[in-house]
Each structure stands twice: as structure tokens, then as C-alpha cells.
């Protein structure tokens, strides 16, 4: 973030920075204490939605980051989201809400792609904004997205720097001019659409399935459900060395397996299901035939057991759990626990009950990973945490087995298979399109104007493009198509040379031939030159007419659709110098004019139809110009009826 703002970031990771708007000068230690208090308040206030969340790799976390270079001291966090992009957008939602709850804070979010919020709103960005000048311009403030603009060349705004601002300048600008830096409504809507539905949307991203698991794993998941992610990743990223530990299980014996309900995220469930794996015969984790009604539960349990065994095999079974006690020994723990109680985190559960203890253990782990953040040398690995739970939290296999009869039903996993219609709907939702209405489809077919295709093509090619390429319409469904016929004809007149420009170049061959003549001769020469150009233009048109006449009788000429003649009689020719020349090669055959619009439309429709509903050159070209053709009613019985 220092300097140009380009970071060598970890792949599939999101970084977030929370700055305190400068209001007065503070000492380093005082600023540190203030930011630490903010970290405690933020993590406590948002604990009800952060604690139960199942993260793919790492949880949301904040820590104090001292000042460095031109970047002031601030709160900082980084989360590796791996394959689950929803973790990244959930963090965007949390950051957005933090700046809404704490208006004195300004936040920025970025990942290894840079300003990914701008990528999400790419269709609505102003032309001046590009990756080269976007450094330190995109922030969240008061829950709104802010983009610090660039002053125009024609105007000078004292508080806007001409170069990309530093972090200090950006914070001062946002503090002094919050309304002037708000992003446009379309950009705000594009980002809001991506984070809409949270926190309720978290529940929709979960999947509950039955798994035939060792009782020890069931007990661990009751205490620390977040360890499910580590186990799935261990199995998903296994190597032959990891599988050596799974030849003979030492921690999770297959004889202790019971049926249990496990809550996954959809990403974790898909990762576990899609991998084909045959266990070692020595492991004892045999599978029933695929036709068995509980085959999926056995398979999921076998894969999870391998993941947990791999994690435990990477640590010693004899270690001190003194690192765990560091959580309750922290001076922040007491105030954190008190804040959780004030925010009704325990949902009225009785102190000391089993469910109360489960939520308390979840809070301890959340506190350790997100607030306490011990040094890496003291941090516990997932395998050590699993063994700690097994050693400190006794469980009764018989009692867990009695819960098999009261398991909640499994969720349907049909969402793993997408139909073409569902895929189209997902693409439309991602692009921010409104849902198509099936009712007025027939009316849309009747009112569709085919001329829109040719008009769009003409309007597109008549525009002059910059060195960056052709500009496509941003919202073609709403903007009417405009076509200036005069400009279009003038453009081709210039190509054909109908309006030759006078040249003063010294390289003109005519000047060498008339060197030394007087002014009257100059006037005569200009008139002669004009007549010569007119004659050349007439010869060119005559040549093109004769070429059309010759091609008209070939297969190429017959492939074009011509206008129907209203008058079958041969057309009368006006007396001119070129009439005999034009007719001499044509004989008695008259050449009918080619209908350019009709040929253009018919060729595009033929190409579009041959795509059979798939992506192709015709649909891509038309969509880029804002033209969306209706479905072919000739091949759709429901529409034709």
C-alpha cells in the first residue's frame, strides 16, 4: 500500500485496513491504545455473526499495525479464502458494516487482483479511472463506497491532488469532503448487489449432510465446528506421504463410527464429494455398494476421517495445553466475555449447560484466532487443537449413538447439478440483469423490430474509435439507437474522393510541370485539375458499375438478395458522357440494386441460428452492441403455439 499501492499479496487472500480519521495529533502509544480498544469493540460487536461462521481457510481478524512510511498506524487483517470466494464478499460486508457503525473509521479492501471492488463495477466506472491511477482512491466510509476523483485539466480544485493521493491525503479528503467523493449510484449498486442478503445469506450457503463418523470426530465438531474446514482441506490437498498415516488409523478407529449430522459450507461439501477416493484396505474404512441407501454417508464419513487423521498425524500426541490457557489469561478475555453476554451471544442458555459450554468453546477459539493472536511459535495447529479437545473433553460413545435416532433430515444436494436455465439465470444475476418475464415473450416476438440489427451495426461502424479500441454501449437495453445518415454518407464520400482536398505539398507532381507560369495559368491549371478529378471519379464509378454487372451473373452475385423492381421496364438513362460507357458492357441485362440491410440481417440471423443457442460470433457481436434477438419461434413449439 505504500507508494504506488501495488502489493505482493498472497494468492486467494483479501487484505483490509481500517484507519481512524485524523482529528488531532497523538503520540504513538496513545494511538496504539485507541486502536486496540477499537479492535476489541469491533470484534465483540460483530461476534454474533463472526463466531458461528465456517471459514474456508482463515477467519476474519484484526490487529494493530504501526505507522510505516507514509501510512499511519491502523487496524489490519488478512484472510486466505482459498476456493470459497464467498468468504471474501462476506468480509466486504463486515467491513462495510463496521464503517457504518463507526463513522470515524475509513476502510479499504483489496486482494491479489488489486481493487477488486472496481472490477465488480467495471461496467459503470468513469473513463478516467484505470488501474494506473486508482491507487489510494477507493475506500468505505459511513457504509458507502467512496472514490476520490481526478481533477479535470480545465479546472483546478485545491483539495484534489493531480497525482494519486497518499493515504494521509486520502483520509483528509474523505474527512473534509465526504459527499464529494461518494461513488455514483450505479457503482454503489453493483457492489451492494454482491453483498446483499447478508447476514441471512450465510445460512443459505450451508449444507447439512449425514456422515458415518468416528465418535471422536463427532465430539470434536460439537466443540469446534470450524475444524471441519481444516479436515476437508487436509483430505482435499493430501499427498502420498499424508496417506501413509491412514494405512492404519491410530486416533479415529473405524469401530467407533456412528451416524451424525454435519454442517458444511457448500464449497466444502462440493470439495469433499467431487473427489473419487478408494481407502486402503488396511484402514478398516470399507464402503457399502453404491446402491446402498447410506452409501453417501459412509463415503463422506470415510473422507472426513482421513482428513482428521492426517491433521493429527502431523503433531505429537504428548504436548502441553498451556497455550490454550493463554486465552483466559489474557486481560482482554474478561471484557470480551462480558461484551458477549451483553450482546446475547449465549441466547439465554444456562451457565454450565452442555450447549453453553459449546458456545463458550467457540468463543474462546474465536478470541484466540481473531483477537488474542499469539505469536506463531505459540499458536496451536489444527491437529493439536483436535487432540486437546479429545484429551480435555470426555465423551460417551453410547450417549452419542443414542442421538442417531433424532438426526435432522439432510439437505438436498441437487444444487451441485446446474441445468442450462439455472446457469443462464446465474449469469444474468452476476451481470445485474433483471429476471426475464416469461409472460410477455409472445408479445416481445410480435413487437420485435428486425431493423434494429442493421441500425445498430451502422451506428457502431460510423463512430470514430480511440487508440484504445471501439467503445461498446454501456446499457444498450435502455439507450435508444441513434443513426446520422448524413454523417454516414459523408464518411463514404470521403473514402471515394467525392470532395478532394486541395494540397499545398511540394511533392505534387503538377507543380513540377508548370514551374514558371503566371497566375492566369495557375487558375487554368486548377480548373483543369478539377475536371481531371471529376473524370477520374466518373471512371471509377463506371468501373465499379461494370464490375457489378459482371458479378451479377455469377454465383456470388446471385447469392445476394436484391430489391424488387417496381417498374419492370428498362430504366431510362439521362444523357451524360458516361451513359454509353456504362451500358456498353451490360447488354440488355439490368443489374438490380443489392438490399444491403436485408442481406446483413439475413446473414446474421443465419449465423445466429446455426449456433443452436450456444455462444458464437453472431450473438457475441450483437450482444456487445446491445441487440438481443428473441428465441427462434420456428423451433420452439411452445412459443409458436
From Swiss-Prot:
Residues 439-641 are annotated as: Transcription activation. Phosphorylated predominantly by CK2 on two serine-containing clusters; involved in cell cycle regulation activity. Residues 481-497 are annotated as: Involved in nuclear export. Residues 499-521, 554-586 are annotated as: Disordered. GO terms for cellular component: cytosol; nucleoplasm. One of its GO terms (molecular function) is histone acetyltransferase binding. Residues 503-521 have a biased composition (Acidic residues). The modification Phosphoserine is found at residues 503, 505, 519. It is found in: Cytoplasm; Nucleus. Keywords: Activator, Cytoplasm, mRNA processing, mRNA splicing, Nucleus, Phosphoprotein, Transcription, Transcription regulation. Residues 561-571 have a biased composition (Basic and acidic residues). Residues 502-531 are annotated as: Acidic region required for transactivation activity. One of its GO terms (biological process) is mRNA processing. Disruption phenotype: Embryonic lethal. Regulator of p53/TP53 stability and function. Inhibits MDM2-mediated degradation of p53/TP53 possibly by cooperating in part with TXNIP. May be involved transcriptional regulation. In vitro has intrinsic transactivation activity enhanced by EP300. May be a transcriptional activator required for the expression of glycolytic genes. Involved in regulation of cell cycle progression. Proposed to disrupt Rb-E2F binding leading to transcriptional activation of E2F proteins. The cell cycle -regulating function may depend on its RUVBL1-mediated association with the R2TP complex. Belongs to the ECD family. Interacts with TP53, MDM2, TXNIP. Interacts (phosphorylated) with PIH1D1. Interacts with RUVBL1 mediating the PIH1D1-independent association with the R2TP complex. Interacts with RB1, RBL1 and RBL2; ECD competes with E2F1 for binding to hypophospshorylated RB1. Interacts with EP300. Interacts with DDX39A. This is Protein ecdysoneless homolog. It comes from Mus musculus (Mouse).
Amino acid at each position: 500500500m505504500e507508494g504506488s499501492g501495488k502489493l505482493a499479496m498472497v494468492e486467494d487472500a483479501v487484505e483490509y485496513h481500517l484507519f481512524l480519521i485524523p482529528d488531532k495529533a497523538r503520540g504513538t502509544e496513545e494511538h496504539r491504545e485507541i486502536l486496540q480498544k477499537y479492535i476489541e469493540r469491533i470484534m465483540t460487536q460483530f461476534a454474533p455473526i463472526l463466531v458461528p461462521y465456517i471459514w474456508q481457510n482463515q477467519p476474519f481478524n484484526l490487529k494493530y499495525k504501526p505507522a510505516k512510511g507514509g501510512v499511519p498506524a491502523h487496524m489490519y487483517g488478512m484472510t486466505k479464502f482459498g476456493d470459497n470466494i464467498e468468504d471474501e464478499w462476506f468480509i466486504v460486508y463486515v467491513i462495510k458494516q463496521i464503517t457504518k457503525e463507526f463513522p470515524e473509521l475509513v476502510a479499504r479492501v483489496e486482494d491479489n487482483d488489486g481493487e477488486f471492488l472496481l472490477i465488480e463495477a467495471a461496467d459503470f466506472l468513469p473513463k478516467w479511472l484505470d488501474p494506473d491511477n486508482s491507487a489510494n482512491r477507493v475506500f468505505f466510509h459511513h457504509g458507502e463506497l467512496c472514490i476520490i476523483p481526478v481533477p479535470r485539466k480545465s479546472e483546478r480544485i485545491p483539495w484534489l491532488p493531480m497525482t494519486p493521493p497518499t493515504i494521509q491525503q486520502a483520509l483528509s479528503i474523505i474527512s473534509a469532503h465526504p459527499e464529494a467523493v461518494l461513488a455514483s449510484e450505479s457503482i454503489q449498486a453493483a457492489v451492494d448487489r454482491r453483498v446483499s442478503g447478508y447476514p441471512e445469506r450465510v445460512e443459505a450457503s450451508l449444507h447439512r449432510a449425514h456422515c458415518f463418523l468416528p465418535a471422536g470426530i463427532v465430539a470434536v465438531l460439537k466443540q469446534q465446528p470450524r475444524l471441519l474446514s481444516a479436515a476437508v482441506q487436509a483430505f482435499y490437498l493430501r499427498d502420498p506421504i499424508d496417506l501413509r498415516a491412514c494405512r492404519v488409523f491410530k486416533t479415529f478407529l473405524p469401530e467407533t463410527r456412528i451416524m451424525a449430522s454435519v454442517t458444511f459450507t457448500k464449497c466444502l461439501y462440493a470439495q469433499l464429494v467431487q473427489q473419487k477416493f478408494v481407502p486402503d484396505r488396511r484402514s478398516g474404512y470399507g464402503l457399502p455398494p453404491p446402491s446402498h441407501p447410506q452409501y453417501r454417508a459412509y463415503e463422506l464419513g470415510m473422507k472426513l476421517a482421513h482428513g482428521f487423521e492426517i491433521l493429527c498425524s502431523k503433531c505429537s500426541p504428548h504436548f502441553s495445553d498451556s497455550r490454550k490457557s493463554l486465552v483466559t489469561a489474557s486481560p482482554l478475555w474478561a471484557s470480551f466475555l462480558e461484551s458477549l453476554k451483553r450482546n446475547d451471544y449465549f441466547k439465554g442458555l444456562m451457565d454450565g449447560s452442555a450447549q453453553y459450554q459449546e458456545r463458550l468453546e467457540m468463543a474462546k477459539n474465536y478470541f484466540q484466532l481473531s483477537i488474542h493472536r499469539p505469536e506463531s511459535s505459540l499458536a496451536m495447529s489444527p491437529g493439536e487443537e483436535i487432540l486437546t479437545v479429545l484429551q480435555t473433553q470426555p465423551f460417551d460413545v453410547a450417549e452419542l449413538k443414542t442421538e442417531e435416532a433424532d438426526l435432522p433430515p439432510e439437505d438436498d444436494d441437487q444444487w451441485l447439478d446446474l441445468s442450462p436455465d439455472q446457469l443462464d439465470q446465474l449469469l444474468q444475476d452476476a451481470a445485474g440483469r433483471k429476471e426475464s418475464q416469461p409472460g410477455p415473450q409472445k408479445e416481445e416476438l410480435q413487437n420485435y423490430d428486425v431493423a434494429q440489427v442493421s441500425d445498430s451495426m451502422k451506428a457502431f461502424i460510423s463512430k470514430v474509435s480511440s487508440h484504445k479500441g471501439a467503445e461498446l454501449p454501456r446499457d444498450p437495453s435502455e439507450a435508444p439507437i441513434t443513426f446520422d445518415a448524413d454523417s454516414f454518407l459523408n464518411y463514404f464520400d470521403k473514402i471515394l474522393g467525392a470532395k478532394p482536398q486541395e494540397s499545398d505539398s511540394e511533392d505534387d507532381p503538377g507543380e513540377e510541370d508548370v514551374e514558371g507560369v503566371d497566375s492566369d495559368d495557375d487558375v487554368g491549371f486548377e480548373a483543369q485539375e478539377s475536371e481531371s478529378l471529376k473524370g477520374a471519379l466518373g471512371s471509377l464509378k463506371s468501373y465499379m458499375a461494370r464490375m457489378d454487372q459482371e458479378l451479377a451473373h455469377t454465383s456470388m452475385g446471385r447469392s445476394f438478395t436484391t430489391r424488387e423492381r417496381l417498374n419492370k421496364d428498362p430504366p431510362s438513362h439521362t444523357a451524360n458522357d458516361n451513359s454509353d460507357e456504362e451500358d456498353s458492357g451490360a447488354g440488355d441485362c439490368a443489374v438490380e440494386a443489392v438490399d444491403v440491410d436485408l442481406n446483413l440481417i439475413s446473414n446474421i440471423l443465419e449465423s445466429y441460428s446455426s449456433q443452436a443457442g450456444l455462444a458464437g460470433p453472431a450473438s457475441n457481436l450483437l450482444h456487445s452492441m446491445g441487440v438481443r434477438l428473441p428465441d427462434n419461434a420456428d423451433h420452439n413449439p411452445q412459443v409458436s403455439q
